Amino acid sequence: FFPGAMSEAREIELAPIVAKVGALDLLIISPDDPEAMVRYSETARASKIPFAADPSQQLARMNGPEIKKLIEGATYLFLNEYELALTLQKTGWSDEELFSQVKIRVTTFGSNGSRIEEHGKPTITVPVPQELAKIDPTGVGDNYRAGFLAGLSWNLGHERCAQIGSLLATYCLETKGTQEYRFTKEEFLRRFQEAYGAEAAAEVSRHLHPRLSA
């Protein structure tokens, strides 16, 4: 692995970006140089910018205090089952203490689907669509989060967001290469309806563009 530009990520300032593009709806802090990740979260808290913490594989490189600084005050926290256990181990937090640090926690459980927890609301559990084949799991989590965040950008509810992410992750699982899958709008909606029903598919359909091609 060669970090390339990531080695200079800690030098990026968020303030000039906000000044240029305007207020941010949500800042996504994905796997990056750990020092940069913590710095972004500190800036987001100080500037009252909503942010999503998505530490992923960088949890292995971060210590407990760094993980705490990254997570505290996040609007969204994305973890898989292993990452959740690792976060609890390194921070010393209980599961309840961890959840209290964020507004919404999204946890994926592989073939057992995903869970969305939000304070004061019922927990949402979303199953995964039936896969056609299991070719390569690399990138499955990234695709889940991409689909989830796309749903957020379309102002969809968390259940729909998780369903979109789950189907996109399934396409990734069925393909060699993290972004090598192909599908048309019709193909995506057909599988989406099979997994989650006609009403859910109709809601998502309004946001998909015909330019999707096989």
Model-derived features: positions:
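Short acidic/polar capping segments at secondary-structure boundaries
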Residues: 5-8, 26, 32-36, 56-59, ...
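Conserved phosphate-binding/catalytic region of the ribokinase-like
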Residues: 26, 91-214
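Short glycine/serine/threonine-rich phosphate/pyrophosphate-binding segments
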Residues: 36-38, 145
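Conserved phosphate/ATP/ADP-binding segment of small-molecule kinases
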Residues: 38-50, 55-125, 133
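Conserved phosphate-binding/catalytic loop of the ribokinase/pfkB sugar-kinase fold
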Residues: 1-26, 31
